[in-house]
A protein has these predicted regions:
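A short, Lys/Arg-rich alpha-helix, primarily the initiator
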Residues: 1-23
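Alpha-helical residues within the helix-turn-helix
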Residues: 16, 27, 58
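Short coil turns linking two alpha-helices in DNA-binding domains
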Residues: 21, 33-35, 49, 63
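Short alpha-helical "recognition helix" segments of helix-turn-helix
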Residues: 23-29
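Key DNA-contacting residues within the recognition helix of helix-turn-helix
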Residues: 26, 39-40, 54, 68
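Recognition helix of helix-turn-helix/homeodomain-like DNA-binding domains
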Residues: 31-47
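Short, basic-rich loop-to-helix N-cap that marks the start of a DNA-contacting helix
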Residues: 45-58, 76
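Short C-terminal boundary/hinge segments that cap the last helix of small helical domains
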Residues: 61-77
């Protein structure tokens, strides 16, 4: 059975296209703050809360499908 994992490549592309760094998610002018631990999870493609993803969407004024997608991991099972 194949598994899926989250991929945040779209998020990183949006930040880059806007001239922003990943640390904009930690410290920004809008007052939204994210822990560096959560930023590390995003960087590793790990799960974060839905609330965190929605906060990022609100911060960047995008929809969820614009920042995250799933990718299939093929297993031998």
């Amino acid at each position: 059975m194949n598994k899926r994992k989250l991929n945040y490549t779209k998020l990183w592309k949006i930040l880059k296209s806007r001239g922003l760094t990943r640390y904009y998610l930690v410290n920004n002018a809008l007052g939204y703050t994210m822990s560096t631990a959560t930023l590390a999870k995003l960087g590793k493609g790990q799960s974060v809360t839905t609330e965190t993803l929605l906060d990022i969407c609100n911060l960047l004024d995008v929809d969820l499908d614009e920042i995250v997608e799933t990718e299939v991991i093929v297993t031998d099972e």
